[in-house]
């Protein structure tokens, strides 16, 4: 039969929508935030101490919502647990269910151990409903000893060490699923798991910078300049590696010039020209690269460094989302017969629309806000010299005290004793 009698493309549409884009995006934030926490707990990067707790709780909050996009995508979400009850030994999705459960349990235990001193202290000091909540979280513990703290520190480090490969597998398997689809040339590459993993670290570090700077701004405190600069340095290195791997993959496809390159080049230059060329490459990769080069300069003004790092992190988060979109949705836009393209427009409503996606992205932030109300998300800082401090029953400001010391130091001894002598020699009334 003549091929001209067919209408191409003959594909009904795409199967994986924006929810499948959100799923690797959220799991990437989970893995990247945990890596930052592990840099402090395992590799003793003391410069990351201000964000160590925030990174761990952020990973837990986003991990608790990571499966929501998959449940919204399923037509029968009530059957989701079947993958755990009757697993298939050769299914990567079944393996993910067990890895996700193990990682979630590890996060819960590690967060509890990190905050256990605070939980026990508040269980003893708080009353009412708040005290009941902390006593439940304390699991019967009413005091902390030096020995128990040492055991907790050892367990935290052990869990952080075990969590690094689990977090990498948790997100790397998503790239493994796409790379294993041999029928799609846009997905079938051995670099796909590595690209997904490195981009996860990029998004996690960028997300932590945005959260830390935003929370400091909301509380009216200055971000730790050394901590922000260190995270910007890690982000710059991870961004260079991620973009280099993506460009190597694309360059290899172009140099090989297989039968599929014609449709892939049309896909990139026409259908993904904005999301790939403009957003992912120019806005999300080139601009953050230049901004981070400015932010990592050692003698840069802290406010300018924080502004450059925060703006670069926001652009990187957009870049990673665009990368997920271009991989998941872009790989479904061309016909399986390489003859024509499929159009896809994201609806506003429905369980796989823009509003539902915005709600899914908001839920982890809401969980993080609740966690901030319940537990201290970063290390206690030293009292600032500009803040008033308490002496006895009076609140005194450091400025009058400093002025008094200055006057005392500059006034000659004879003049300092003159008012006292005048008071003693004055006649009593």
Give residue spans per PLM region.
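N-terminal signal-anchor module of multipass membrane proteins
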Residues: 1-42, 369, 385-387, 394, ...
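Membrane-interface segments at the starts/ends of alpha-helical transmembrane spans
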Residues: 9-19, 85-92, 147-154, 183-192, ...
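Membrane-interface transmembrane-helix boundary segments in multi-pass integral membrane proteins
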Residues: 19-23, 94-97, 192-196, 258-283, ...
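TerminUS-proximal long segments
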Residues: 307-411, 415-429
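Loop-to-helix transition at the N-terminal end of transmembrane alpha-helices
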Residues: 14-25, 48-60
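Transmembrane-helix bundle segments that line or gate the permeation/cavity pathway
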Residues: 26-44, 54-86, 92-142, 156-159, ...
């Amino acid at each position: 039969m003549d091929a001209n009698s067919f209408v191409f493309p003959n594909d009904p549409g795409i199967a994986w929508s924006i929810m499948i884009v959100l799923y690797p995006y959220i799991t990437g934030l989970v893995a990247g935030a945990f890596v930052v926490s592990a840099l402090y707990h395992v590799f003793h990067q003391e410069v990351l101490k201000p964000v160590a707790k925030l990174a761990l709780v952020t990973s837990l909050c986003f991990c608790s919502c990571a499966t929501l996009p998959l449940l919204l995508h399923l037509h029968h979400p009530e059957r989701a647990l079947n993958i755990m009850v009757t697993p298939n030994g050769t299914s990567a999705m079944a393996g993910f269910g067990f890895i996700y459960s193990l990682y979630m349990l590890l996060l819960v235990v590690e967060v509890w151990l990190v905050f256990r001193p605070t939980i026990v202290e508040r269980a003893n000091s708080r009353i009412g409903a708040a005290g009941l909540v902390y006593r439940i979280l304390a699991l019967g513990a009413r005091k902390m000893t030096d020995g128990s703290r040492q055991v907790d520190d050892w367990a935290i480090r052990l869990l952080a060490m075990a969590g690094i490969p689990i977090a990498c597998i948790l997100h790397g398997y998503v790239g493994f699923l796409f790379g294993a689809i041999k029928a799609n040339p846009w997905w079938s590459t051995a670099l796909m798991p590595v690209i997904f993993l490195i981009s996860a670290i990029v998004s996690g570090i960028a997300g932590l910078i945005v959260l830390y700077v935003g929370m400091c701004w909301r509380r009216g405190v200055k971000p730790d300049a050394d901590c922000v600069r260190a995270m910007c340095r890690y982000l710059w290195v991870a961004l260079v590696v991620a973009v280099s791997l993506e460009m190597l993959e694309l360059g290899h496809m172009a140099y090989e010039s297989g039968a599929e390159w014609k449709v892939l080049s049309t896909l990139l230059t026409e259908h993904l020209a904005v999301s790939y060329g403009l957003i992912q490459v120019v806005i999300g990769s080139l601009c953050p690269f230049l901004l981070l080069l400015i932010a990592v300069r050692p003698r840069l003004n802290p406010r300018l460094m924080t502004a450059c790092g925060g703006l670069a992190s926001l652009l990187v988060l957009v870049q990673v989302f665009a990368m997920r979109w271009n991989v998941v949705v872009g790989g479904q836009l061309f016909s399986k017969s390489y003859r024509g393209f499929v159009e896809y427009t994201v609806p506003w409503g429905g369980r796989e629309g823009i509003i539902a996606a915005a709600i899914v992205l908001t839920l982890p932030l809401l969980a993080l806000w609740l966690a901030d109300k319940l537990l201290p998300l970063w290390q206690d800082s030293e009292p600032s010299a500009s803040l008033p401090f308490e002496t006895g029953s009076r609140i005194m400001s450091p400025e009058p005290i400093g002025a008094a010391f200055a006057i005392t130091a500059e006034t000659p001894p004879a003049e300092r004793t003159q008012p006292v002598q005048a008071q003693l020699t004055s006649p009593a009334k």
